[in-house]
Amino acid sequence: EKGFAEARIIKVLKQSPLAAEARCDHYWICSKLQTLSYEEQLKEKEKQVVDAFQRIGGFTDFTINGVRSAENKYNYRNKMEFTFSPHRWILESEPEGVDSSFALGLHIPGRYDKILDINTCHIQPDIGNKILGIAREVCLKNLDLKPYDPKTNIGFLRYLMLRFGVKTNQLMVNIVTAYDDINKLSPLIDTLLKEVPEITSMVNNVNTRKADVAFGEFENLIFGNSFIEEKIGNLKFEISANSFFQTNTYQGKVLYDEVLKIAGLNGDEIVYDLYCGTGSIALYL
């Protein structure tokens, strides 16, 4: 885009006083901002909002309050979607001959067909990384558990979706497949339920369409309930595999408390919650 440019660091000649050490091994693909101190990240976020109002909206007279910082900067996300793929993105740092026929991880930005194989993702709870490792190990040992290829429409495993009740300690595993075959999933199901007793819900969404999405035309309940529970304030929500819910429970409460304070409701009003997902904002009010 005119007036904007992207660059890649080749060599650091002098470290910026604003720099921070990234926790993630793949920060330069997933989250480049990790190399910037958290305080500076908040300032940059505020600048983006100001820019949107000024440059895009054309506003000149407005006030932007500071960004509310997060208490939990890592291990906060209550939903993760990892993609199975036969097209693994090979890193420059990896040796030649690395097997590229299996990956379980996240999409390379701008590439629908390449997946970065991930062992540890620091924005999800630690138990999610345990599940990620077990799933990868089981799939590599069982030839029937082939990753789905959207180019050829061949393969079985599409997504591994995890949902965490960070306030309830409930855990859902949703295995999304390209067709219905619970027996083929048995090695993965049995191993996960044996080695991760914290799992309270396991489902299998079946997506036979070529559309590369993590929800299916129908769902098989494998273990426990078809939902997990999560709490925001005094409210408890039932969240299914395909529900939309605020992905940061901690900051969700901060946001809802701010809305509640600004709205100043007395109980006589009618609140319309449009495009609401589970309706958590209006219920909170």
Briefly describe each language-model feature range.
Residues E1-L285:
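Accessory RNA-recognition modules of RNA-modification enzymes
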